[in-house]
Amino acid sequence: MRTQYCGQVTAAHLDQIVTLCGWVHRRRDHGGVIFIDLRDREGLVQVVCDPDRAEMFKTAESVRNEFVLKMTGKVRRRPAGTENANLTSGEIEVLCHEIEVLNTSATPPFQLDDENLSETVRLTNRVIDLRRPQMQKNLMLRYKVAMAFRRFLDGAGFIDVETPMLTKSTPEGARDYLVPSRVHPGQFFALPQSPQLFKQLLMVAGFDRYYQITKCFRDEDLRADRQPEFTQVDIETSFLNETEITALMEEMIRFVFKESLGVDLPSPFPRMTYAEAMRRYGSDKPDLRVTLELTEVTDLMKDVAFKVFSGPANSGGRVAAMRVPGGATLTRGEIDEYTKFVGIYGAKGLAYIKVNDASQPNETGLQSPIVKNLSEAALRGVIERTGAQSGDLIFFGADKAKVVNDAIGALRIKLGHEKGYVTGDAWRPLWVVDFPMFEYDEDDKRWTACHHPFTSPKDEHVELLKTNPGECLAKAYDLALNGWEIGGGSVRIHRADVQATVFEALNIGAEEQQVKFGFLLDALKFGAPPHGGLAFGLDRVVTMMAGAESIRDVIAFPKTQRAQCLLTNAPGEVDEKQLRELHIRLRQKVETQVEVGKA
């Protein structure tokens, strides 16, 4: 039906007859000559319809935007001065000989080049939205990235094995999506939050190197970088230690970026412990492009009169300072806006000191309402530790450690990018290692797994599982890139006794272990090899590469932040017959919620 894609016609085809198929992107009538920009997934080409061919010209007069056309014509150079350097086909145009309307189109709900559309409008009309050149580029990039992952893993001896989509509900952190069983009344499958247990079982079965690009499902509150269903590049390997696994995965990520974007990432990626990342950046996925850092000053504030600082300092909280070079020029209005911003993260305020004269750490050299309530020794310590100079500003966070880390860590990113405290590097990868095994849930008064309960503790910390779980570090590693976690994994527990001990630390008793994880514990008894792995979020990786604002811009048919599909109106009601077959009865009629406003 066609000889070329529209976007692939170039000067190499001069004087050739080509047949093209595509959509009318734009039609223009200039002095009796009609110009049609014909579009397909590869791009645009300008087609010229001359009135000398009467029948063809009459058809051209009738076409409108988004009509589907088949056009045959001769490739020629554009007149001098009319070239378009933004198009691959910008040096040439096609003089139309024949035109056939393959299909007409209703008036589209919006122009494809309209950049002020709400996300609700875009997602409701997703099919039209996907015709926009940027969306076409995003999904083509997604394909290239996925294929690059596959090429590397295939070449490294990994095999692609599918794992079940209907699985058993197990506690992995987020809520499961449950699927009722028709043939087993009152029982439910769960859609997998990850293939975690199955890929471990494949290692026990001796497959050595596994990968899968697969869908995962988590019924959790959504953010800009989250979806209820997301795509994961899932990887597991046997007989490699933590260092060997991260080295192999680092090689893979460099390969994927080079193949997909032509970008050379640094080698090797730097490594940083979780404790250092939280201390210096307030985040376990720090954006290293931002040069601002947090400085620990908790010990300096224990004896000061300022209760906002001394309170947290003496009750297990944190007081952190962040030096902003040249920041004394910030206006009161700007500081007020930053104060409102940190409030989003639970901070009760944002203390600051303007450093007018760093040589005088007192009310003479420092400007702030809090200076009079801080000792000169504390102020001198702050100036020395932060390295503050005259003309700088120092922000403070004082609260529970989590609030300080979240609030000042977020302020660091916002201020850094807004005011130019950045390195200028395009990509700054970082391995974050030595995560805690557990964190304490104050509400439930119990330990929970920081990653998941199948992560191996460091060899020297196995004994701490029973005596002091809070001090136990894990053989876990995350790959952060520009402030995003793009991948995470760990060495797994391969001994049944250690796995049972971890379950006990999580308050999962022997009976519950057998009910929920008996199949895993049994498998580990039959010569399970040392194994570990990692999973990369394909949606996040592509979002970063594409420079998109949301992962919804790199997924063909995404859900909204209320976990709805505006195109198909899913989820939806089902009829009583289907419910009866599933042995389900609704306790009360549920009001149908209609998505409005922000998507």
From Swiss-Prot:
<feature type="binding site">
    <location>
        <begin position="537"/>
        <end position="540"/>
    </location>
    <ligand>
        <name>ATP</name>
    </ligand>
</feature>
<dbReference type="GO" id="GO:0004815">
    <property type="term" value="F:aspartate-tRNA ligase activity"/>
</dbReference>
<keyword id="KW-0963">Cytoplasm</keyword>
<keyword id="KW-0547">Nucleotide-binding</keyword>
<feature type="site" description="Important for tRNA non-discrimination">
    <location>
        <position position="30"/>
    </location>
</feature>
<feature type="binding site">
    <location>
        <position position="218"/>
    </location>
    <ligand>
        <name>L-aspartate</name>
    </ligand>
</feature>
<dbReference type="GO" id="GO:0005737">
    <property type="term" value="C:cytoplasm"/>
</dbReference>
<feature type="binding site">
    <location>
        <begin position="218"/>
        <end position="220"/>
    </location>
    <ligand>
        <name>ATP</name>
    </ligand>
</feature>
<dbReference type="InterPro" id="IPR029351">
    <property type="entry name" value="GAD_dom"/>
</dbReference>
<dbReference type="InterPro" id="IPR004115">
    <property type="entry name" value="GAD-like_sf"/>
</dbReference>
<comment type="subunit">
    <text>Homodimer.</text>
</comment>
<comment type="similarity">
    <text>Belongs to the class-II aminoacyl-tRNA synthetase family. Type 1 subfamily.</text>
</comment>
<dbReference type="InterPro" id="IPR045864">
    <property type="entry name" value="aa-tRNA-synth_II/BPL/LPL"/>
</dbReference>
<comment type="function">
    <text>Aspartyl-tRNA synthetase with relaxed tRNA specificity since it is able to aspartylate not only its cognate tRNA(Asp) but also tRNA(Asn). Reaction proceeds in two steps: L-aspartate is first activated by ATP to form Asp-AMP and then transferred to the acceptor end of tRNA(Asp/Asn).</text>
</comment>
<dbReference type="GO" id="GO:0050560">
    <property type="term" value="F:aspartate-tRNA(Asn) ligase activity"/>
</dbReference>
<keyword id="KW-0648">Protein biosynthesis</keyword>
<dbReference type="Pfam" id="PF02938">
    <property type="entry name" value="GAD"/>
</dbReference>
<feature type="site" description="Important for tRNA non-discrimination">
    <location>
        <position position="81"/>
    </location>
</feature>
<dbReference type="GO" id="GO:0006422">
    <property type="term" value="P:aspartyl-tRNA aminoacylation"/>
</dbReference>
<dbReference type="InterPro" id="IPR047090">
    <property type="entry name" value="AspRS_core"/>
</dbReference>
<feature type="region of interest" description="Aspartate">
    <location>
        <begin position="196"/>
        <end position="199"/>
    </location>
</feature>
<dbReference type="InterPro" id="IPR047089">
    <property type="entry name" value="Asp-tRNA-ligase_1_N"/>
</dbReference>
<dbReference type="Pfam" id="PF00152">
    <property type="entry name" value="tRNA-synt_2"/>
</dbReference>
<dbReference type="GO" id="GO:0003676">
    <property type="term" value="F:nucleic acid binding"/>
</dbReference>
<dbReference type="InterPro" id="IPR004364">
    <property type="entry name" value="Aa-tRNA-synt_II"/>
</dbReference>
<keyword id="KW-0067">ATP-binding</keyword>
<dbReference type="InterPro" id="IPR012340">
    <property type="entry name" value="NA-bd_OB-fold"/>
</dbReference>
<feature type="binding site">
    <location>
        <position position="492"/>
    </location>
    <ligand>
        <name>L-aspartate</name>
    </ligand>
</feature>
<feature type="binding site">
    <location>
        <position position="172"/>
    </location>
    <ligand>
        <name>L-aspartate</name>
    </ligand>
</feature>
<feature type="binding site">
    <location>
        <position position="227"/>
    </location>
    <ligand>
        <name>ATP</name>
    </ligand>
</feature>
<dbReference type="InterPro" id="IPR006195">
    <property type="entry name" value="aa-tRNA-synth_II"/>
</dbReference>
<dbReference type="InterPro" id="IPR002312">
    <property type="entry name" value="Asp/Asn-tRNA-synth_IIb"/>
</dbReference>
<dbReference type="GO" id="GO:0005524">
    <property type="term" value="F:ATP binding"/>
</dbReference>
<dbReference type="Pfam" id="PF01336">
    <property type="entry name" value="tRNA_anti-codon"/>
</dbReference>
<dbReference type="InterPro" id="IPR004524">
    <property type="entry name" value="Asp-tRNA-ligase_1"/>
</dbReference>
<keyword id="KW-0030">Aminoacyl-tRNA synthetase</keyword>
<protein>
    <recommendedName>
        <fullName>Aspartate--tRNA(Asp/Asn) ligase</fullName>
        <ecNumber>6.1.1.23</ecNumber>
    </recommendedName>
</protein>
<feature type="binding site">
    <location>
        <position position="485"/>
    </location>
    <ligand>
        <name>ATP</name>
    </ligand>
</feature>
<keyword id="KW-0436">Ligase</keyword>
<dbReference type="InterPro" id="IPR004365">
    <property type="entry name" value="NA-bd_OB_tRNA"/>
</dbReference>
<feature type="binding site">
    <location>
        <position position="451"/>
    </location>
    <ligand>
        <name>L-aspartate</name>
    </ligand>
</feature>
